[in-house]
UniProtKB/Swiss-Prot annotation:
<dbReference type="GO" id="GO:0032229">
    <property type="term" value="P:negative regulation of synaptic transmission, GABAergic"/>
</dbReference>
<dbReference type="GO" id="GO:0031667">
    <property type="term" value="P:response to nutrient levels"/>
</dbReference>
<dbReference type="GO" id="GO:0048680">
    <property type="term" value="P:positive regulation of axon regeneration"/>
</dbReference>
<dbReference type="GO" id="GO:0061193">
    <property type="term" value="P:taste bud development"/>
</dbReference>
<dbReference type="GO" id="GO:0005169">
    <property type="term" value="F:neurotrophin TRKB receptor binding"/>
</dbReference>
<dbReference type="GO" id="GO:0006120">
    <property type="term" value="P:mitochondrial electron transport, NADH to ubiquinone"/>
</dbReference>
<dbReference type="GO" id="GO:0055093">
    <property type="term" value="P:response to hyperoxia"/>
</dbReference>
<dbReference type="GO" id="GO:0045666">
    <property type="term" value="P:positive regulation of neuron differentiation"/>
</dbReference>
<dbReference type="GO" id="GO:0048167">
    <property type="term" value="P:regulation of synaptic plasticity"/>
</dbReference>
<dbReference type="GO" id="GO:0007612">
    <property type="term" value="P:learning"/>
</dbReference>
<dbReference type="GO" id="GO:0051091">
    <property type="term" value="P:positive regulation of DNA-binding transcription factor activity"/>
</dbReference>
<dbReference type="GO" id="GO:0007406">
    <property type="term" value="P:negative regulation of neuroblast proliferation"/>
</dbReference>
<comment type="similarity">
    <text>Belongs to the NGF-beta family.</text>
</comment>
<dbReference type="GO" id="GO:0008038">
    <property type="term" value="P:neuron recognition"/>
</dbReference>
<feature type="site" description="Cleavage; by MBTPS1">
    <location>
        <begin position="59"/>
        <end position="60"/>
    </location>
</feature>
<dbReference type="GO" id="GO:0009410">
    <property type="term" value="P:response to xenobiotic stimulus"/>
</dbReference>
<dbReference type="GO" id="GO:0030061">
    <property type="term" value="C:mitochondrial crista"/>
</dbReference>
């Protein structure tokens, strides 16, 4: 499982040319180039030009990516909006990638969460693991959702943290050219079995509906005054069930 996870991370970094790490000015204009952009990119960039020829052990790979992961998590904490100034700070999430091609995997933090769950269960007996498997217990999601990478060409516009409508720029200038902005969106599946209501809800007593909810991510945008800068914008990030009680019965 460890080797599989590392393989997924390697492929993830292979397609990623750059990733936004810091927010110089949430609402401000700032530089077009994202501040402190890091390219962890390939094994060569992490371990030196001869890394590919001399090979790496599983242990050294694990140590390297553990260090990268710690940096990502530390930076993620630094760029979160001040909760005193932003009521929706708890809705912040990172689902943006700058790349020259469509990413092949979900965001890295999603893979980390799955790997963490695996590590938490690593010491359990086979019997416990077998009974804890959601598929074996017949667990189903209350609402059916779909997740996919979309580009700024698909989004066009978005709402920022001040409530204004901004234009989402499709490409971001970097030192060696331009990269596209990709957003990993999750929304309710219009073709799913829960389009008429949430799964498992007693319809005799409750009205239910699956709704797409949004969170904030950082993106390069342009406001109505043609000012370009990095801002927090809303994108679709989950599908939740809302309930209202039936009255008059």
């Amino acid at each position: 499982m460890t080797i599989l996870f590392l393989t997924m991370v390697i492929s993830y970094f292979g397609c990623m040319k750059a990733a936004p790490m810091k927010e110089a000015n949430v609402h401000g204009q700032g530089n077009l180039a994202y501040p402190a952009v890091r390219t962890h990119g390939t094994l060569e960039s992490v371990n030196g030009p001869r890394a590919g020829s001399r090979g790496l052990t599983t242990t050294s790979l694990a140590d390297t990516f553990e260090h990268v992961i710690e940096e990502l998590l530390d930076e993620d904490q630094k760029v979160r909006p001040n909760e005193e100034n932003h009521k929706d700070a708890d809705l912040y999430t990172s689902r943006v990638m700058l790349s020259s091609q469509v990413p092949l995997e979900p965001p890295l933090l999603f893979l980390l969460e799955e790997y963490k769950n695996y590590l938490d269960a690593a010491n359990m007996s086979m019997r416990v693991r077998r009974h804890s498997d959601p598929a074996r217990r017949g667990e189903l999601s209350v609402c059916d959702s779909i997740s996919e990478w979309v580009t700024a060409a698909d989004k066009k516009t978005a709402v920022d943290m001040s409530g204004g409508t901004v234009t989402v720029l499709e490409k971001v200038p970097v030192s060696k050219g331009q990269l596209k902005q990709y957003f990993y969106e999750t929304k309710c599946n219009p073709m799913g079995y829960t389009k008429e209501g949430c799964r498992g809800i007693d319809k005799r007593h409750w009205n239910s509906q699956c709704r797409t909810t949004q969170s904030y991510v950082r993106a390069l945008t342009m406001d109505s005054k043609k000012r370009i800068g990095w801002r927090f914008i809303r994108i679709d990030t989950s599908c939740v069930c809302t309930l209202t009680i039936k009255r008059g019965r």
